[in-house]
Amino acid sequence: MSCVNIRGCRIGEGRPKVILPIVERTEAAILEKAAQFSTLSADCVEWRVDWFEGFQSPAAIARCIQKLRVALRDKLLLVTFRTKAEGGEQALSHPEYLAFLRLILDTDCADLLDIEFFTAGADLPALVEQAHSAGVAVVCSSHDFAKTPPRAELVCRMVQMQQAGADLPKLAVMPQCRADVLELLSSTAEMADLHPETPVITMSMGALGAVSRLAGETFGSAMTFANPGQASAPGQVSLDVVNAVLDALKL
């Protein structure tokens, strides 16, 4: 599996890198959380802008992200607007979503930018190119909160993300049975073995899928989300447990 090197953090090499989500509503609460996270044993912080009370104000977003970048010190910053269609807090029109992505790139504060595979649609390759021109790595994401598609479909979707130029394809799916968790893990291993052009980020959500968040080094998922107090998705495991298990399962 290849590696994405961002400011010395080698994503896709060795231990999965740990992401902490910020899902606060106000700028003050976001910055307070960022200051706390800057001291914790994690590699990256995700700002979920769809939770931000000022998500409709470009000026408020730009002001907050600039302060956030300073508060996080050396932590990587992943910026995400999770649309309502993909399990997020707010809905955006297609033009609004594209404008948000371009705003984040213009701030020159993000290390990684989440771009939703289905929301971006035909604009995805151009958006990836714009991000790369701005020196920002792309996490191309797809979320299914209802089911786990078959392995072949999961692999096909991640390969399409690779073909569009994404640095880190990301899939999150909901299991309905144990076999669904195995489908997700198997698709992850297949990507690592047969399509190693990029690292991938995968997870099976909910309590049933929690094991997938802890076994990334074994199966080939390069990053995992941990719960530092407030989860941003079902099944997130606490930071202390994540770090302990990742250390115990290190290859």
Q: Predicted regions span which residues?
A:
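Short beta-strand/loop segment at the start of cytosolic alpha/beta domains
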Residues: M1-R7
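Active-site beta->alpha loop and helix N-cap motifs at the rims of alpha/beta catalytic domains
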Residues: C3, G14-S133, H143-T148
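Short boundary motifs at domain starts and secondary-structure transition points
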Residues: R7-E13
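Catalytic alpha/beta core domains of metabolic enzymes, predominantly
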Residues: L112, F117-L251
